């Protein structure tokens, strides 16, 4: 809803107090980075091209594009050689790191994560969770995550919101909700 891929059945969607409309949705998208469960990568593009696609569309120079992608690869611990591969040639953890890089490419104000660990095996999940927590703390960004895993919610969030039928049922710290 926030990035305009789905229209609300009723009501309205606002970001930073501003109503999201078809006319301004692209401006809102530039302020939000998002990662979906399977990464949402384009299979016919290399990892590097997947990350830089929007920035290239916005007119970034080749030098700026490569510098930012290399910076994000270091931040997410994605091996340099992985940038030249296609998504099908990458592990699940590498694809998620790539999705995170793409979300961070334009230095968004807000980062949305939709089940970012859902398809990963436990060892990859643990490594990626540790890395993500460090990354998000260092960037000092607002991060919202959708997850069915309460432990994951508590690991990442200082505030957890439980939803039921599209409404807030409870909110607080994980410790508060467990009590």
Indicate where each model-derived feature is located.
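Conserved ABC transporter NBD signature motif
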Residues: 11-19, 28
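Conserved catalytic motifs of ABC-family nucleotide-binding domains
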Residues: 107
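ABC ATPase "signature
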Residues: 171-172
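Conserved ABC ATPase "signature" C-loop
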Residues: 165-166
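Conserved ABC ATPase "signature" region
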Residues: 56, 63-81, 133-134
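Helix-to-loop junction immediately C-terminal to a conserved catalytic motif
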Residues: 3
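Conserved ABC ATPase signature
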Residues: 86-90, 94
């Amino acid at each position: 809803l926030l990035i305009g891929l789905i229209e609300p059945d009723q009501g309205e969607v606002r970001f930073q107090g501003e109503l999201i409309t078809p006319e301004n949705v692209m401006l809102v998208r530039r302020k939000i980075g998002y990662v979906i469960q399977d990464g949402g990568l384009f299979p016919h593009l290399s990892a590097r091209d997947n990350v830089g696609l929007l920035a290239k569309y916005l007119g970034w120079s080749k030098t700026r594009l490569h510098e930012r992608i290399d910076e994000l690869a270091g931040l997410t611990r994605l091996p340099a050689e992985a940038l030249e591969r296609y998504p099908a040639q990458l592990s699940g953890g590498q694809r998620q790191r790539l999705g995170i890089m793409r979300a961070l490419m334009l230095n968004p104000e807000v980062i949305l994560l939709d089940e970012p660990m859902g398809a990963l095996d436990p060892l990859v999940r643990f490594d990626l969770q540790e890395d993500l927590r460090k990354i998000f703390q260092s960037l000092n960004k607002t991060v919202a995550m959708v997850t069915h895993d309460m432990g994951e919610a508590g690991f990442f969030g200082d505030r957890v919101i439980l939803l039921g039928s599209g409404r807030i049922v409870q909110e607080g710290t994980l410790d508060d909700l467990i009590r």
